[in-house]
Amino acid sequence: TESEELFYADNTFLTLGGTSAIYKRTTNPHTTIGDGLALAFNAGCEIADMEFIQFHPSAIYTESEEAFLISEAVRGEGAYLIDQNGERFMPAIHELAELAPRDIVAQSIYRQMLKYDQEYVWLSLKHLDPQVVKHRFPNIYEKCQELGIDMCDRIPVAPAAHYMVGGVRTDTHGQTNIKRLFICGELASSGIMGANRLASNSLIECLVFGKRAIEASRKNLKTSPTQVFKPIYHCNDNYAALYVHLKKEISRIMTDYAGIIRNAEKLKQGLNELESLEDNLPREINEYYTLICRNLITVARLIIRSALYRQESRGGHFREDYPCSDASYLFHIVQQKEKDLRTLPVNTKKSLN
């Protein structure tokens, strides 16, 4: 119709995914910039545990920053992570070597990259049977071929932002603190992931909590809307370049200051640079590109503030200035618009009622 239309519902569901694309390298689509998170935050939702960002250890490295995921199954098949000298480094770090938890492997790879001033390490499969590799991993093999990489030899890999463990705080039926607003999928923070995430558990979460949210929403059905609003946003194409520039700057800030290995100095520097970016944004509150620029800054700030508050290392959050876990930090960090950051105890006895 080439016109704006509003549809009114008895219940609203947000299923807009995570925030990983605010980092330089991500296994996610480039659109996963956390706009759903910013939307919920600005509406008054409680946002929980945003410091826990999971980085997948092994995504293909290319100069274009494309980060195609190399499954843990490849390492499970026997592939080795090797440094620039061709030496394995994981056996000296963890008893499970290449099969250690994702956060341990990602941190270890990142340290090797810093040590040798390189953008990647190698995932070596040259000691494995090429026919087995091709048969077991046809999709990965095909992708490597497209990129001019011989998977049966070695693959350049580096960590990439993969999953947002935190998100909009919900109960076990997907209900937020705002009545009739439900959140499902990666955008939700139901608490079941803890500080980390086991591979593929998020798929089960979508199925289970999606079904429960639908069942809960049926209690709210009405026959007619109670309020009517007119669209208020417009789009100024002159600001498109501003968005591209700002997204690049924020991905740099998040990668350099709030990435795999963090510390207080870097996190504070990140907050300062975000504030500077925000101060230079246009003042058109209801313009589309300005809105998504502000959303990007909002999401980045939520992550950094939470990471700065948690003065310990736990799960997907590692502080080199606080490298050990601390039992006194066994709580959820909750942020809400125009309210002070607060903490909530972890409910270790939660059941699905």
PLM regions and their residue ranges:
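Thiamine diphosphate
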Residues: N28-F41, I47
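Hydrophobic/aromatic ligand-binding patch that stacks against planar heteroaromatic rings
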Residues: T12, L39, H173
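Glycine-/small-residue-rich beta->alpha transition segments that form the dinucleotide
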Residues: N11, T15-S20, L187
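Glycine- and aromatic-enriched mobile tails/lids
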Residues: I82-P91, E98, I109-Q112, Y163-V165, ...
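Core beta-strand elements of the Rossmann-like FAD/NAD(P) dinucleotide-binding domain
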Residues: S3-N11, N177-I178
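Alpha-helix capping and helix-loop boundary segments enriched in small/acidic/polar residues
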Residues: E4, Y23-T31, E65-L69, A73, ...
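FAD/FMN-dependent oxidoreductases across multiple families
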Residues: P138-F182
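An anion/pyrophosphate-binding glycine-rich loop and adjacent beta-alpha core
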Residues: L39, C45-P156, A216-K222
